UniProtKB/Swiss-Prot annotation:
<dbReference type="InterPro" id="IPR041616">
    <property type="entry name" value="PheRS_beta_core"/>
</dbReference>
<keyword id="KW-0547">Nucleotide-binding</keyword>
<keyword id="KW-0479">Metal-binding</keyword>
<dbReference type="GO" id="GO:0004826">
    <property type="term" value="F:phenylalanine-tRNA ligase activity"/>
</dbReference>
<dbReference type="InterPro" id="IPR005146">
    <property type="entry name" value="B3/B4_tRNA-bd"/>
</dbReference>
<protein>
    <recommendedName>
        <fullName>Phenylalanine--tRNA ligase beta subunit</fullName>
        <ecNumber>6.1.1.20</ecNumber>
    </recommendedName>
</protein>
<dbReference type="InterPro" id="IPR036690">
    <property type="entry name" value="Fdx_antiC-bd_sf"/>
</dbReference>
<dbReference type="InterPro" id="IPR033714">
    <property type="entry name" value="tRNA_bind_bactPheRS"/>
</dbReference>
<feature type="binding site">
    <location>
        <position position="467"/>
    </location>
    <ligand>
        <name>Mg(2+)</name>
    </ligand>
</feature>
<dbReference type="Pfam" id="PF01588">
    <property type="entry name" value="tRNA_bind"/>
</dbReference>
<dbReference type="GO" id="GO:0009328">
    <property type="term" value="C:phenylalanine-tRNA ligase complex"/>
</dbReference>
<dbReference type="InterPro" id="IPR005121">
    <property type="entry name" value="Fdx_antiC-bd"/>
</dbReference>
<dbReference type="InterPro" id="IPR005147">
    <property type="entry name" value="tRNA_synthase_B5-dom"/>
</dbReference>
<keyword id="KW-0067">ATP-binding</keyword>
<feature type="binding site">
    <location>
        <position position="461"/>
    </location>
    <ligand>
        <name>Mg(2+)</name>
    </ligand>
</feature>
<dbReference type="InterPro" id="IPR020825">
    <property type="entry name" value="Phe-tRNA_synthase-like_B3/B4"/>
</dbReference>
<dbReference type="InterPro" id="IPR002547">
    <property type="entry name" value="tRNA-bd_dom"/>
</dbReference>
Length: 831
């Protein structure tokens, strides 16, 4: 929002010595983001005056039309004699008032004016156009001032506002009121403690009858709707110089007087307006949602397919506006429009925001509606617009007014007195809290030690006690909060769960994984790309009421989509050998959860019943660990060829992560989307006599890889870390043996379809309690083992706690392990 300081002074009794820089500092201290302070016209100097054209002589014999003019500049040239000036513009005549730069003047860009001979005549100055003076972009020729604007010789720089200080403010989504001069002026008045003149406070007509017929189909989409009309408007009436200048300083292009007035009122009051040529309307207006198949050609000449979520303005011919976003082409103001209808409305912010994103139309109107506009200002804004149309365009204001009011009074916020002080750690007197809240427009009623605060209609962002505390604190000054280090309460350090999570993060990082933090949002398309069955529990997700992206309206039930997208981004930037992991929450809705979670108070501790109600509404949020691997885990080099990351690495990573918690995973072959059905492992933990599923790991299905654009043979894992932590709760420290380890290697030949995990499980069972670990270190397929067969080589580590194992004992354990594998999987010891 660009704010000219001179315009601001019309509403705020600023000290004369207040500078734009000082003003910016004040606003920054109030929490507004002033990005720049622009000194427009700072490079303009010298005599720039009003002149009257006395004579015009057409010069011939040149390649383009040239005129030699004599111009009365009063006493500005020191002689009182007319000034001779060469000019090529054709849009002025004898007797017109113009702007003249005399010799010695410097125009924007360092363009110095001097007397010089040109086209055979002495030119002593320049008759200026708007663009040459930096007023606005204009290719219509020089400025012709209205009659009576000023006497010849009068300094024009102040009259035209050539020098101006402009604040450029970045308005955050919660500060919609700051997208207007009215809103900024109120903040400035509070900062300086001076009087504020509200431009919205003006005499308003009491009657609201006889206006253009209109209706609102659903009060939820439009809480207030106002129409006011004028007749006899002069479409040739120009936009006055002062209005064009202000619009330009605010970054708005001048179009025509009628359209410029709607933009001017929007900048002044913060209420977007729309103007129609009334002769193009067909019957009553209705505000409603779009119907399937409806289309509208908007002002940018694009035919748009409308969504049932779009709010429309319609007449008997169909849609004429996308409400709050852009008007339709068929009813726009034309060069011949004489009867004009002005619309001022309060549309639902969420609908406008979704429509703007859906159609990729971000307008000045939609920016204000989606941040929230004043619910009570519509009649004042429409009245201001028709008054300007009458004053500047010669129109006649119609008596009839359309005013549909479905607004609901805001409920007061009940807050304990002194709440702001408790939040800031500063002892604010109750009187100060009340004064500051009233300063921002709140109505405050004190009842004992509580305050009932009703926020003003222009502050939809004030919804709870903490919002009110912020208003008190920022107006008292953040800089006045003492910088005291808080006293840390005594504690026991990190919890066991926090220590485990940090430890597993370090372990994965040590193994070459990079941690990523992804947004927890997914869409139905992600579930389709994962090839999840229609009845898969992961498709049942929490839907957001106001998603950041309409394509991702759900909270994730799995970490994998985010990891896949992060992998694709990194591969696209040249990181072909990469391993990523994420530790985060997934969200599963409770079957019996209420439709809407309650909002708990912030100025007191919630009751047990309130906490229970909130807990019941929240989804289950287990913590998962996910990882994805692609490319080579060991790169090739002078030491030899590289080794690709495989499904076995994914399984091994999951086992290493679980081992941090002292939990050993049990690996079983499985078929589970999105993994390859022949290269997927289900991961279990032992819970007494039963096994609890905690996750899956393996190589991804080729169609999933193709759907996401992943590198071929990408592997992934996802485990439920909460379940692993629970399994670790009863874990005890293992007994450490001081006796040497004995190793035995066995190579077993099995059918190619037999999972290695089943062979490993059989070896563990057969070896018994003296087996310390078993590791698969080689897989071989080839002529030596026969077609349809494979050789699996395992390293067995054996150790006793009370003795050194003998050769006979280790051989006996090895034989028992091989026998168990042969019985369960048909394994044969390879010779």
């Amino acid at each position: 929002m660009r704010v000219p300081v001179s315009w601001l002074r019309e509403y705020v009794a600023l000290p004369a010595e207040a500078t734009a820089r000082e003003l910016a500092d004040k606003l920054i201290s109030l929490g507004l983001e002033v990005e720049t302070v622009e000194e427009v016209g700072a490079d303009i100097s010298g005599p720039i005056v009003v002149g009257r054209v006395l004579t015009i002589e057409e010069l011939t014999g040149f390649k383009k039309p040239i005129r030699f003019c004599t111009v009365d500049v009063g006493d500005a040239n020191g002689t009182g004699e007319p000034q001779g000036i060469i000019c090529g513009a054709r849009n002025f005549a004898e007797g017109d008032l113009v702007v003249v730069s005399l010799p010695g003047a410097v125009l924007p860009g360092g363009f110095a004016i001097s007397a010089r001979k040109t086209y055979g005549r002495m030119s002593e100055g320049m008759i200026c156009s708007a663009s040459e003076l930096g007023l606005w972009e204009d290719h219509e020729g020089i400025i012709v001032l209205p009659e009576g604007f000023a006497e010849p010789g009068t300094k024009a720089d102040d009259l035209l506002g050539l020098r101006e200080s402009v604040l450029d403010i970045a308005v955050t989504p919660d500060r919609g009121y700051a997208l207007s001069l009215r809103g900024i002026a109120r903040e400035v008045a509070a900062a300086y403690g001076v009087e504020f003149t509200d431009p919205a406070v003006r005499p308003l007509p009491s009657a609201a009858e006889g206006g253009y017929p209109a209706s609102v189909a659903d009060p939820a989409i439009c809480s207030r709707y106002v129409l006011r009309g004028v007749t006899g408007f002069d479409p040739a009436a120009p936009t006055p110089l002062w209005m064009r200048r202000r619009l330009h300083l605010c970054g708005v292009r001048s179009i025509s007087l009628a359209v410029d007035i709607t933009n001017y009122v929007m900048l002044e009051l913060g209420q977007p307006l729309h103007a129609w040529d009334r002769s193009t309307l067909r019957g009553p207006i209705e505000v409603r949602l779009a119907r399937p198949g409806e289309k509208l050609e908007t002002l940018d000449h694009v035919v748009r397919a409308l969504d049932p979520d779009d709010i429309l303005i319609t007449d008997e011919s169909g849609p004429i506006n996308i409400a709050g976003v852009m008007g339709g082409l068929s009813t726009e103001i034309r060069e011949t429009s004489t009867d004009i209808l002005i619309e001022a409305a309060h549309f639902d912010a969420a609908h406008i925001a979704r429509t703007s994103r859906r159609h990729q139309l971000s307008s000045e109107s939609s920016r204000r509606f989606e941040r929230g506009v004043d619910t009570d200002i519509q009649l004042a804004a429409a009245t201001r617009a028709v008054e300007l149309l009458a004053e500047l365009g010669g129109a006649t204001i119609e008596d009839g007014i359309t005013h549909i009011d479905h607004t609901v009074p805001r409920e007061p916020i009940v807050v304990r007195a002194g709440h702001a002080g408790r939040v800031a750690g500063v002892d604010y007197p109750v009187e100060t809290e009340i004064a500051r809240l009233r300063q921002v427009g709140c109505e405050v009623v004190q009842e004992g030690d509580t305050l009932k605060v009703t926020p003003p209609s222009w502050r939809p962002d004030l919804t709870d006690p903490n919002d009110l505390a912020e208003e008190v604190i920022r107006n008292e000054g953040y800089e006045n909060i003492p910088a005291l280090l808080p006293q840390a309460p005594p504690g026991r350090g990190l919890t066991r769960g926090q220590r485990l999570r940090r430890a597993v993060g370090r372990t994965l990082a040590d193994r070459g994984f990079f941690e990523v933090l992804n947004y927890p949002f997914v869409g139905v398309r992600d579930f389709d790309r994962l090839r999840l069955d229609e009845d898969d529990a992961r498709r049942t997700a929490v839907r957001l009421a106001n998603p950041l992206n309409d394509d991702e309206p759900l909270l994730r039930t799995t970490l994998l989509p985010g990891l896949f997208k992060a992998l694709v981004r990194n591969v696209g930037r040249g990181f072909t050998d990469i391993a990523l992991f994420e530790m985060g929450l997934v969200y599963h809705p409770k079957p019996d959860a209420p439709a809407k979670a309650p909002i708990l108070p912030v100025d007191r501790a919630p009751t047990a019943e309130e906490r229970a109600t909130l807990e019941a509404a929240l989804p289950e949020q287990p913590r998962h660990i996910g990882a994805v691997l692609a490319g080579q885990r060991l790169r090739s080099g002078w030491w030899g060829g590289g080794e690709p990351a495989t499904w076995a690495d994914a399984i091994h990573t999951a086992k290493e992560a679980a081992s941090v918690a002292g939990v050993e995973l049990i690996v079983r072959a499985a078929q589970y989307a999105p993994w390859h059905p022949g290269r997927c492992a289900a991961l279990y933990v032992a819970d007494g006599d039963r096994e609890v599923l905690v996750g899956h790991a393996g190589e991804l299905h080729p169609r999933v890889i193709k759907a996401y654009g992943l590198p071929s043979r990408t592997s992934a894992l996802e485990i439920d870390w909460d379940r692993i932590e629970a399994a670790a709760a009863a874990a005890t420290a293992p007994q450490i043996s001081t006796y040497p380890v004995a190793t035995q290697d066995v190579a077993l030949v099995v059918d190619a379809s037999v999972p290695a995990a089943e062979v490993e499980a059989a070896l563990r069972e057969g070896a018994g309690e003296l087996l310390e670990s078993v590791r698969l270190f080689d897989v071989y397929t080839g002529d030596q083992v026969g077609e349809g067969r494979k050789s699996l080589a395992y390293a067995l580590r054996l150790r006793a706690h009370d003795r050194t194992l003998t050769v006979e004992e280790t051989n006996r354990i090895k034989d028992a392990a091989v026998a168990a594998a042969a019985e369960r999987t048909g394994a044969v010891l390879r010779g």
